[in-house]
UniProtKB/Swiss-Prot annotation:
Top enzyme class: transferase
Pathway stated in the Swiss-Prot or TrEMBL entry: Metabolic intermediate biosynthesis; chorismate biosynthesis; chorismate from D-erythrose 4-phosphate and phosphoenolpyruvate: step 5/7
Cofactor: Mg(2+)
Assembly with partners or alone: Monomer.
UniProt organism field: Streptococcus equi subsp. zooepidemicus (strain MGCS10565)
GO cellular component: cytosol
Residues annotated for ATP binding in this entry: G10, V11, G12, K13, T14, T15, R116, R151
Described function: Catalyzes the specific phosphorylation of the 3-hydroxyl group of shikimic acid using ATP as a cosubstrate.
InterPro entries the record matches: P-loop_NTPase, Shikimate/glucono_kinase, Shikimate_kinase/TSH1, Shikimate_kinase_CS
List of residues binding Mg(2+): T14
Binding site for substrate: D28, R52, G75, R134
Protein name: Shikimate kinase
Length: 164
């Protein structure tokens, strides 16, 4: 069964997935490979609706895999009702990684290599509203929740590896 790592941007989904399995699937990288450009460039060129369609198609593909796979999802994967229904069908294997808004905001502010449009184009208050909206959706889908704030990615991966 596919284990989906859910959570807000900056929480460490990709880093933890890499600790769990060197052959993990990162939905954002899969999408970028399909479109031949960065997601931020695609957003600018084609818009969010086109991106969300690609994201839904990619989610369907990774959930259809027969083998046990670790998947790092994009932070906005839960915005689509169709995606939420697909994720619900992956019952017992949806793992939410959490941290406080302030911790995530600070991480994103310090990350000079990966500047994300959603972060750059909103005030802190607007970004907090996005965080709250998405957290409610993540929590409604999560079978297991792990707070990552005082844990290393390796410790979080060990917790996930020991889950039944």
């Amino acid at each position: 069964m596919t284990k989906l790592l859910l959570g807000f941007m900056g929480v460490g989904k990709t880093t933890v997935a890499a600790q769990l399995d060197e052959h993990f699937l990162d939905m954002d990288r899969l999408i970028e490979a399909k479109i031949g450009m960065s997601i931020s460039a695609f957003f600018s060129y084609r818009g969010e609706a086109a991106f969300r369609k690609l994201e839904s198609d990619t989610l369907q593909e990774v959930l259809a895999l027969d083998n046990e796979t670790i998947v790092s999802t994009g932070g906005g994967v839960v915005l689509s009702k169709a995606n939420r229904e697909l994720i619900r069908k992956n019952h017992k294997h949806n793992i939410l990684l959490t941290a406080s808004f302030e911790v995530l905001y600070d991480r994103l502010k310090k990350d000079r290599l990966c500047q994300r449009p959603l972060f750059l184009n909103h005030s802190k208050a607007e970004f907090y509203a996005i965080f709250q909206q998405r957290m409610a959706l993540y929590e409604g889908l999560a079978d297991k929740v792990i707070n990552v704030e005082h844990r290393t990615p390796k410790e979080v991966a060990a917790i996930i590896a020991n889950m039944s």
